């Protein structure tokens, strides 16, 4: 009985983690500004701000 209870708790934890990560993926796919909730809008670059650190990143 203890094993079934433990398996149920583990399955619940895995389901909650998957639900949370899929929600984040869904929000980022449609509007990346929700990743930064304090930002009111605008473009979020996916590269570091100028000046680049040495050595320069390979693209």
Swiss-Prot record:
The keyword rRNA processing does not apply. It is found in: Secreted. One of its GO terms (cellular component) is extracellular region. GO terms for molecular function: hydroxyapatite binding. The modification Phosphoserine is found at residues 21-22. Keywords: Biomineralization, Phosphoprotein, Secreted, Signal. This is Statherin. It comes from Bos taurus (Bovine).
